[in-house]
UniProtKB/Swiss-Prot annotation:
SUBUNIT field: Component of the Mediator complex.
Region Disordered, residue ranges: 260-281
Xref: InterPro entries: Mediator_Med6 (IPR007018), Mediator_Med6_fun (IPR016612), Mediator_Med6_sf (IPR038566)
Presence of the UniProt keyword Transcription in the record: yes
Role noted for this protein: Component of the Mediator complex, a coactivator involved in the regulated transcription of nearly all RNA polymerase II-dependent genes. Mediator functions as a bridge to convey information from gene-specific regulatory proteins to the basal RNA polymerase II transcription machinery. Mediator is recruited to promoters by direct interactions with regulatory proteins and serves as a scaffold for the assembly of a functional preinitiation complex with RNA polymerase II and the general transcription factors.
Record's protein name: Mediator of RNA polymerase II transcription subunit 6
Leader sequence segment: none
Family that this chain belongs to: Belongs to the Mediator complex subunit 6 family.
Primary localization: nucleus
Species the sequence originates in: Candida glabrata (strain ATCC 2001 / BCRC 20586 / JCM 3761 / NBRC 0622 / NRRL Y-65 / CBS 138) (Yeast)
A single BP term in Gene Ontology: RNA polymerase II preinitiation complex assembly
GO annotation, cellular component aspect: core mediator complex; mediator complex
Amino acid sequence: MDTPLDELQWKSPEWIQAFGLRTDNVLDYFAESPFFDKTANNHVIKMQRQFSQLPNNGAAAGSMNPETMRDAHSEDMGQEQEFSYVDPIRRAILEKYVVHAFLERELMKVRGIEYVLANVREPDFWVIKKQRRTSPTAIEPLQTYYIVGANVYQSPTVFKIVQSRLLACSSHLSATLAELNNLVEFKPSQGVQYKNILDMPVTTRKTGNTANVGSVPGTISASLNMPMVNTGRLNSAGAATIGTSGVPNSAGMTGANTMATGQTGATSRFENGSSRSSTDAISTDTLDKLLITSMKSTPEYI
């Protein structure tokens, strides 16, 4: 068979339909599977009982009667000492199911490979253990099998369990390293470093700080969050402001108020007829703020 036994699932619905599946005959059902070794002592004992000259019909009938077998074994006061070498779970199984206790006594008489019922969770779960008996009370476990419902499985080895866990860990680590590799960038001035996704790109910050730096003072003030002075006519309250012509207005006409600081200021320096250059239109405070902004900006190396 090319398929490994630990990757094989076996079941026989026909056998279950004919005989049923319960704790008394679960070993007989397991003996039909490819996991069972035909040279095991269980098969030898079964053949001996089948072709024995002893009258086994009555014994077989009695084995199917739990009350009769329980009364027979209740007379055996040394049963606990007889099966003292097995674990408490198996000892409870041998005390409850007389068929398995009879098989255990027969297996104690021979040496070699054998199959025993190790655990029961009725009505649909059994654990069968393959072991090698070296003496009546000394056994060596070899393999474990599970019967879940009608399906029979072989338990995986420790090597394959560890191999599967390591393979899963390495797969997740490879995926993580691939994601981290996408977050690495290289700059000749700074070398290899990780990208900071929360920060804005340098080009965006540069554009936001230095856009529209021209000869129009109002635009410069707006981009630097500084007071922006708009010229216009008098508001309805009659507050005196100086327009673009430099002549105070006294009429109660609506106009644009001074923004950002809530204060009105003279804009005579921005008059149309002024002979001053555009550089003189920027005040000393504005130049200082421009200098501080340029010092705080991130340098870009070429």
